[in-house]
Amino acid sequence: LSAIPDTPAAAGWRWAPAWVLAFVALWPAPGYAEAVMVLGALAAIARLLLLRFRGGMRLLSGPAWALTSVLFCSYWLPELLSAFDAVDRARALREAAVDLRYLPFLWLVAAAVADARGRRITFGGLGAIVALWTVDALAQALTGTSPLFWGIDGIKQALSGHPMCAVGEAARVDRLSGVLGPCNLKLGIVLASLSPFALYAAARRFGSVGWLLAAAAVGVVVLLAGARAAWLTYGLVLLLSGWRVLGWKRLLGVFVFGALALGLLAATVPQLRERLARTAYALSADQDGVDLALSGRTRIWGAALCMARAHPLNGVGARGFRDAFPACDPVPTQPAAWGTGPALHAHQIVLEILSETGVLGLLCWLAGVALAWRAWRYADAPARARARPALLALGVTVFPLNTHLAFYSTFWGGLTLLLAALYAGSLLARDSDPGAAAS
C-alpha cells in the first residue's frame, strides 16, 4: 500500500511522541500513566474519526497499520478466547473488553515513530528517561535516597496526605528501588528492557566510549536493583548491541570487566552477595536447592503445568492464575517461599500463556512472533537500522529462557505492547531514512 503524501491535516500527530514519552515518564505514578494512555487512545480515535480514516495513510504506512494491529490481536485474542470458561468469567470478559483501549494507543505509538523527526524525539526521549532514572538510582546507591522518588512522594503527600508507599514496605526493601519506589521493585527489569534506547543513543552521539559509559552506569543499577531476570535481560542487550559497536574481542573484555565489577559489588553490598549465594544453590542436584535458588518458582511452574493440563485448549483465563493456583499447588501444606497467599502469575512467559490462555493462546502469540520476524526479514537495511533499538528491547523483554513479570497485567502488558508498536512503526515507517542507522 502506498502512503498518501503528508498534508497539514496530519500535523496534529506531531504531538504523538509527547504522548508516548509522558506515558513512560509517569510510570512511577501508575494511575497518571494509565490516564495518559487512555487519553492518548481517545485522541487517536478522535483523530481518525475527524479524518474519517482517510488520513490513516498520512499517519502510518499500510503495512505499519497492519503489523501494529496484528501484534495487538496476537496478545488480545488469547485473552478473549480464555475468558468464556475462565475461573472468574465475568472478570475475565470485563478485562478483555477494557484491554481494547490499547489498540488505538498503539496506533498512536506507531505513528510517533513513523518519520525521522518522530523517531528522533521518541527514541531519544526514551534514552533520556533511562539516563535520568539511572543517575537517580546511582544517587540513591550513594545517599540512600532517590531524589526523584523523594520529590514524587512529597507531591503525593501534599496532595493527598498519604505517602506513595507504606512505612512497612519502605523498611523491608532490600534492593535499589529508584524512581519507582520501595513498593514497586521493578526498576532493574524496566531499565534492562528499555536500555537499548539509551545505549544506541550514546553510541550514535559519542561512539564506543559513550556506549561503554552508558553500559557501565546502567549495568551497576541493574545489578544493585537485585532482579536476577534483569541481569540476564541486560546481558542479552550488551551482547546484541555491543558487538556492533565494539566488535567481539572488545565486547569480551567488557564482559570480563563486568564480572570483576560484579565481584567487587558483591564484596561490598550484602544484599547482592546474598542474591548471588542464593543463585549458587541452582548448581545443586537437590530439587529443594534449585527451588530455593529460584525463590520458589519451581513450585509455581509445577502449578502452571497442572493448569495447562487441566485446561489445555484455552487455559484458566488471563489473570486467573491466582484463583486457580490453590487447586494446582503441588505442595499445599508447605509454606511458600514468596510468603502468604497464592502465587499471582506463572513468572515465565510460555507457562503464563499456556496456563492462562492454553494452546490457542500460544498459537496466537507464535503467529504474532512469526509475522514480526517476517516483517524484519523482508525489510531493507535502512528500515532494520531504524527499528533495531525497538526490536532489541522487545526481543529481550519476551526472551523465553528467563523469568518474567506478568504479561497479562496492566504494567508489564502495557510495556510489552508499547515496544511492539515502536517496532512496527519504526520498521515500516512512512519515510526511507538511511540516516537513521544505528551504530
Where are these regions (language model features)?
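Transmembrane signal-anchor hairpin modules in multi-pass inner-membrane enzymes, especially those
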Residues: 1-94, 111-124, 128, 153-154, ...
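Alpha-helical transmembrane segments of multi-pass inner-membrane proteins
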Residues: 19-21, 43, 104, 120-246, ...
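Membrane-embedded alpha-helical segments of multi-pass membrane proteins
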Residues: 30-50, 96-107, 186-195, 231-239, ...
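Transmembrane alpha-helices of multi-pass inner-membrane enzymes
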Residues: 39-47, 238, 365-371, 390-402, ...
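Membrane-interface catalytic loops of GT-C/OST-like multi-pass glycosylation enzymes that act
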Residues: 90-94, 181-185, 225-230, 343-348, ...
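Hydrophobic transmembrane alpha-helices and their immediate junctions
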Residues: 128, 356-397
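A membrane-periplasm/extracellular boundary helix in multi-pass inner-membrane enzymes
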Residues: 135, 139-144, 224-225, 242-293, ...
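Long extracytoplasmic/lumenal interhelical loops at the membrane interface
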Residues: 288-302, 314-357
